[in-house]
């Protein structure tokens, strides 16, 4: 028998699909649900969608599977101290593979449009390999942003230890993803270090952040929405979160139990 994994198309997303796409998706899910060779269909981090598809296709094959996080138990370096970042500076970090669909360029464009303030008030960290498709524009925008604010750029595949040190020292993790129909590994870091994320409010990513109370959600994660949020960080007390609920649901053991049982 086979176990498959699938990203779901939620009710709110059907409106964005053409009639042809809706029919095609329905056929694919129906075939998976009624294929005797498939024992289980796992939907990452979304129990309500699993229940929805079980009702729709009169089966019990759909099941939520956790998005396991890497537990960090190492003694981490002090990112702020090592990079001469003041303790009262607001550190906003964007981590992982940096690409257009992750909203990387929109973040830079938003920074560029921000009202000029003391450059020591904000530090923006971009940590992760920059996608070749956006590399030239990334560095052009980064150079312009650096005239007003401090940017720390680590354009390579960062170790878990380095990413963890960055997250631990951050005030907010920026995940204004344009493709928000799936979970994100950044949530595991946010939950472990109790650092809020700034996320889209829609689709699966928004639902997870909202349900687990992992940070800020916004219906606008384009340039204006990001700019508005960044400027609000100076005006309002920054959010604190407790990631324990998310961590309990997304252990490696939970992932393996769903996969193997």
Where do the PLM segments sit?
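Short, small-residue-biased leader/transition segments that mark boundaries at the very start
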Residues: 2-8
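Membrane-proximal helix-turn-helix segments that form the acceptor-binding/catalytic region
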Residues: 18-42
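Short beta-strand->alpha-helix junction loop in the catalytic core
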Residues: 47-49, 61-77
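Conserved donor-binding/catalytic core segment of Leloir-type glycosyltransferases
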Residues: 85-102, 108-111, 124-126
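Nucleotide-activated donor-binding/catalytic signature segment of Leloir-type glycosyltransferases, i.e.
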Residues: 128, 136-161, 165
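Acidic donor-binding loop of glycosyltransferase active sites
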Residues: 165-182
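Short hydrophobic beta-strand element within catalytic cores of glycosyltransferases
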Residues: 172-173, 196-200
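A charged, aromatic-enriched C-terminal amphipathic alpha-helix characteristic of glycosyltransferases
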Residues: 222-225, 234-261
């Amino acid at each position: 028998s086979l176990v498959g994994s699938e990203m779901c198309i939620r009710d709110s997303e059907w409106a964005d699909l053409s009639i042809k796409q809706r029919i095609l998706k329905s056929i694919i899910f129906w075939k998976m649900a009624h294929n005797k060779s498939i024992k289980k269909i796992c939907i990452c981090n979304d129990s309500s969608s699993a229940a929805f598809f079980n009702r729709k296709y009169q089966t019990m094959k759909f099941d939520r599977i956790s998005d396991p996080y890497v537990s960090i138990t190492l003694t981490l370096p002090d990112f702020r101290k090592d990079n001469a970042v003041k303790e009262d500076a607001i550190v906003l970090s964007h981590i992982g593979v940096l690409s257009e669909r992750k909203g990387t360029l929109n973040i830079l464009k938003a920074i560029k449009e921000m009202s000029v303030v003391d450059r020591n008030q904000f530090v923006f960290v971009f940590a992760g390999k920059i996608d070749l498709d956006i590399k030239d524009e990334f560095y052009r925008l980064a150079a312009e942003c650096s005239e007003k604010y401090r940017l720390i750029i680590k354009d390579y595949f960062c170790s878990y230890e380095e990413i963890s040190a960055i997250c631990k020292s951050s005030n907010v993790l920026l995940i204004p993803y344009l493709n928000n129909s799936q979970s994100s590994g950044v949530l595991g870091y946010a939950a472990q270090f109790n650092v809020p994320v700034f996320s889209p409010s829609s689709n699966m990513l928004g639902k997870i952040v909202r349900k687990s109370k992992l940070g800020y959600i916004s219906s606008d994660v384009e340039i204006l929405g990001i700019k508005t949020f960044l400027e609000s960080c100076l005006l309002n007390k920054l959010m604190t979160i407790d990631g324990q609920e998310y961590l309990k649901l997304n252990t490696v053991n939970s992932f393996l139990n769903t996969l193997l049982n």
